[in-house]
């Protein structure tokens, strides 16, 4: 029996998955690495050592911070967009587009015909890092920010292109007695606006949309803002059970 391991090393997290020959997920791990990428990946691999004994094992790395680790370790590397596409084509084959938010990047992948990727630039606006910054500004955890957003009554316009500009929008609202619940939802709406307007570049988002990445996996309020903004019903807004580990799963599929 052969097993395949996929490791996705991003800007803030390491995701490790183990697939069997039928592409069934046997193990998954999602952890922050705090810049100790190799150490965190090795610790996770060590924890599943017993599962690998007596098996033929293949391993592939992906992710924005994975190439250096792959080169230093002599392990195969696959670009993240191809890893994600491999997982989507295998597990959700009728997908029209993917929206993926990471720690410091955001991307949209269009399927149907040639694969087309749109990715944000060097600014972390509209990403997990932006959400972390805004939670700190409001003196709450990211989970608390999410819970607050679900009780909102109105949405304020907030710039998400840059944390500095967003802060200049948020502080006056709070100073004037604005509800934290409304500001929290407005922060998520800013992420949605930045992603949709900044990355579609006029191309219509339609059909079945799959949402991937840690922020979209863990934050219900962020999911809600995307679904309402894009006017998606349940059949067209897909949030996979392991959407935070899809790129790692795709890397394993490429092994």
Language-model features and meaning:
Residues 2-8, 58-60, 94-100:
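Short glycine-aspartate micro-motif
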Residues 4-39, 43-46, 115-117, 121:
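Short glycine-rich, Thr/Ser-proximal phosphate-binding strand/loop in the N-terminal lobe
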Residues 30-33, 49-82, 110-117:
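Short beta-strand-loop/turn "lid" adjacent to the catalytic site in phosphate-handling enzymes
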Residues 36, 113-154, 162, 253:
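Glycine-rich phosphate-binding loop plus the immediately following alpha-helix
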Residues 45-57, 195-207:
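Phosphate/pyrophosphate-binding loops at sites that engage ATP/ADP/AMP, CoA/4′-phosphopantetheine
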Residues 65, 203-229, 240-244:
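Glycine-rich phosphate-binding loops at beta-strand->alpha-helix junctions
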Residues 131-132, 238-255:
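Glycine-rich phosphate-binding/hydrolytic loop that grips phosphoryl groups
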Residues 166-201, 244:
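Adenine-nucleotide phosphate-binding core of ATP-dependent small-molecule kinases
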């Amino acid at each position: 029996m052969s097993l395949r391991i996929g490791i996705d090393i991003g800007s803030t997290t390491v995701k490790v998955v183990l697939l069997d020959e039928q592409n069934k997920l046997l193990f998954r791990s999602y952890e922050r690495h705090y810049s100790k990428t190799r150490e965190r990946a090795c610790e996770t691999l060590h924890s599943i050592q017993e599962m690998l004994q007596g098996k033929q094992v293949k391993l592939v790395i992906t992710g924005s911070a994975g190439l250096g680790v792959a080169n230093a370790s002599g392990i195969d590397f696959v670009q993240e967009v191809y890893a994600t596409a491999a997982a989507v084509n295998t597990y959700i084959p009728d997908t029209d587009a993917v929206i993926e938010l990471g720690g410091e990047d955001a991307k949209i992948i269009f399927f149907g015909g040639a694969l087309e990727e749109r990715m944000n630039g060097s600014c972390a606006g509209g990403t997990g890092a932006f959400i972390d910054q805004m939670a700190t500004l409001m003196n709450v955890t990211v989970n608390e920010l999410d819970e607050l957003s679900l009780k909102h009554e109105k949405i304020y316009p907030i710039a998400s292109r840059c944390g500095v500009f967003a802060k200049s929008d948020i502080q006056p609202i709070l100073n004037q007695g604005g509800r934290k619940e409304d500001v929290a939802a407005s922060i998520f709406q800013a992420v949605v606006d930045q992603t949709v307007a900044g990355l579609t570049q006029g191309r219509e988002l339609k059909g079945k949309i799959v949402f991937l990445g840690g922020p979209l996996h863990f934050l219900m309020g962020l999911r809600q803002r995307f679904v309402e903004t894009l006017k998606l019903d349940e059949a067209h807004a897909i949030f996979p059970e392991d959407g935070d580990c899809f790129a790692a799963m795709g890397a394993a599929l490429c092994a």
